[in-house]
């Protein structure tokens, strides 16, 4: 699956907000967005009034960049969400929250989703005792996610746990840091994903045009 490999900090500057794509660095004075809080490029400082379409497009781009998903897969998530019963906004959020790389990040085994994706790609993550190397794998309620025993001493995992062990876990997850495992208990409600700075309704309106 293709993925974005360019500078992460430029994405935050383009969206005009911190997306926390680099973990701990985003909270330090090394954060590029804090030093240059304007879009990259020669005209980055220019203030532009967005049209309704522009607002919708920015919402979509922001959500894609937060979860590290490119357009083809993100549209597929929308199409799946729109076919399901219930609130399409919540269905879309559930689709991206169920990604294995996202769940590894949410459990606190990685400082950001990029590192979580690498952990999955490199075979460090088990789902229900079996190795899964597909970051977009859709985790289901009741699935147990753990770090392989041979991988528990690698620095990114140990640093992430040290950073996250005293933080509250999202309410749809439970985590056991002593045993390097966690459980995806249920799908999240839209209002529970409090760190998503996106108007999801704008994305739905964009795709349904």
Curated annotation (Swiss-Prot):
Q: Which family does it belong to?
A: Belongs to the universal ribosomal protein uS4 family.
Instruction: Provide the function of this protein.
Output: One of the primary rRNA binding proteins, it binds directly to 16S rRNA where it nucleates assembly of the body of the 30S subunit. With S5 and S12 plays an important role in translational accuracy.
InterPro entries in the cross-refs: Ribosomal_uS4 (IPR022801), Ribosomal_uS4_bac-type (IPR005709), Ribosomal_uS4_N (IPR001912), S4_RNA-bd (IPR002942), S4_RNA-bd_sf (IPR036986)
Q: What quaternary structure, including any partners, is listed in this protein's UniProt entry?
A: Part of the 30S ribosomal subunit. Contacts protein S5. The interaction surface between S4 and S5 is involved in control of translational fidelity.
- Coiled-coil parts of chain: none
Report the record's Gene Ontology biological process terms: ribosomal small subunit biogenesis; translation
User: Can you cite an annotated GO cellular component?
Assistant: small ribosomal subunit
| Residue ranges of domain S4 RNA-binding in the record | 98-164
Query: Which terms are listed as keywords in the entry?
Result: Ribonucleoprotein, Ribosomal protein, RNA-binding, rRNA-binding
Name listed for the protein in its UniProt record? Small ribosomal subunit protein uS4
Q: What one GO molecular function would you report for this record?
A: structural constituent of ribosome
| HAMAP family noted in UniProt | Ribosomal_uS4_B (MF_01306_B)
